[in-house]
Amino acid sequence: EMSRGLGDVYKRQTYELFGGKDKLCEPFMAAMEMIHTHSLIHDDLPALDNDDYRRGRLTTHKVYGEAMGVLSGVALLNRAYEVMLSAFDLTEDKDRVIAAMRIIADKTGINGMLGGQSVDVENDGKPLEHKMLDYIYKNKTSALIEASMMTGAVLAGASEKELKVVEQAAENIGLAFQIQDDILDVTSTQEELGKPIHSDEKNNKVTYVSLVGAPAAASRVKELSDHAVELLDDLDRKNGFLDLLVESLVSRRK
């Protein structure tokens, strides 16, 4: 699971990478946090992952009931777009705001997060090969990081060519993040993660670890994160903190 606020950090750092200095990205940071939280609330519902704990606390539906879990998730998604619309009041460059909203709508909808989640549900308990697993991961997790980093870039005035590089880097970061999640599910503790471990095995989920083993999965995480750093460095724009953030994926414990 992407940590609370991590997408915001990627968005802010990418915004600053391309010279953004004002508050234009802030409504989008808040909106992405709402969209991410909406996805987690719904993921935890009995109809999907049926998880009781998230971030060390009881999940929304365990505290407030299943109906409120559904409604609060939808409310957050709706509120996210209300908040993004407020960005029109912060700039004369309306085209950048429109472009950012289009990216988020695309990356979190059927072509991204929700599409990946749907394919994941349809294949629950079925044997999967690398190609299908990559598709699910790229859409469920990478799409959120792509949305965060690409909106940061476009709001700061990145070119189409630069935006493509950011998209590729973010895809690598997202895949690395999700594979590291698979590794932590079998190597970490519930106290460290703040949620039950071995949940993938319990739910008969195919993961990178179940396909290739933890050592090979760890090598893949390093390969993907190294490639992401190379892509970002090739932009000839320096943000050492962003590089450090990507590299920390390899060693994270939660």
Predicted regions and their residues:
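Single conserved hydrophobic/aromatic residue that forms the stacking wall/gate
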Residues: 1-10
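A short glycine/serine-rich beta->alpha loop
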Residues: 4, 17-23, 59-68, 134-135
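Active-site cofactor/substrate anionic-group-binding motifs, chiefly glycine-
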Residues: 14-48
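Alpha-helical scaffolds flanking conserved acidic
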Residues: 21-35, 97-103, 162-173
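Acidic, Mg2+-coordinating active-site segments of isoprenoid diphosphate-utilizing enzymes
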Residues: 41-63, 72, 76-87, 108-129, ...
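Transmembrane helix-loop-helix
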Residues: 86-106, 225, 232, 239
